[in-house]
């Protein structure tokens, strides 16, 4: 990724601000979520191969579309209705100045309008025997944000895995179980951040190693227990004894307990995905921080003094400190960030990066499945759209008939 600011889980893209899961040749994107091959667009979600679009959901192969959803290979549309190119340009004039008030108004209007558009039960593309959401080019995989995976279950942000179970944030592991980021590893079990390893158990942050048990921070090592080097024969004998005893305890078969994390719960992204109160966290035996790294009350520029339109902005903002409209945290605008706002004709944000990140996550569906029925044919479906949500949800067959 090049020139990306306040983004998460983005790759092979450049010139991005406030994006989440923007992948594969995206450029000049602002507030885009779950998109691929997007150029010069803002406020898009679950869209592919689009350019010069704004406020869109599930668009494919579209250009110059504004406030549209479920369109395929369309151009010059507003709220899913075709308009002449000159009329489109005229109606976009007010938005082109990068007005904050206009952008906020459009967010509200689009959120209400889009409820009338049916949603596909899940975003699963070119895959076979898969269940979850945001799954692409995979076979017999269950999970969320899954790319080119085979024979895997309970996967989260996984790429090119084979025969793995309970994986988080990883690429190219094989035959691994209950791990975080065992990238390019083979037979790694119950371990965290062990890359390019094989035959590793209950270890943390070990790289390019093999045959380790209860180790941490090792590189280019083999036949170690608790970071102590053994011969191959001694390692195999001791490891067999330890594992036989471990098999009778609750430790065996699980990754390290969350309470052993060096980070407080509210310091991590877990707080955004699965928010808990302080009492809930402490009751589970986990850490809670009372001193998160931010300041308040040190602002030097009042939000009321920031021009509504980006075309009226001054470089003076680069030397000032702002206060978030939502949480009062202080934040600053960076020079390359401001340049991208101007280039993309989007307004200066009034919220801090943390609150903007929270709002983006709120637009994504939860990583959980519900049993529902297709809103058109009544077929049983497993979907990340909770039953109480207001959207109309269609099975794959009914949705494809709707959009093609």
Q: What spans do the regions from the language model cover?
A:
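Long, distal/terminal scaffolding or interaction modules
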Residues: 1-404
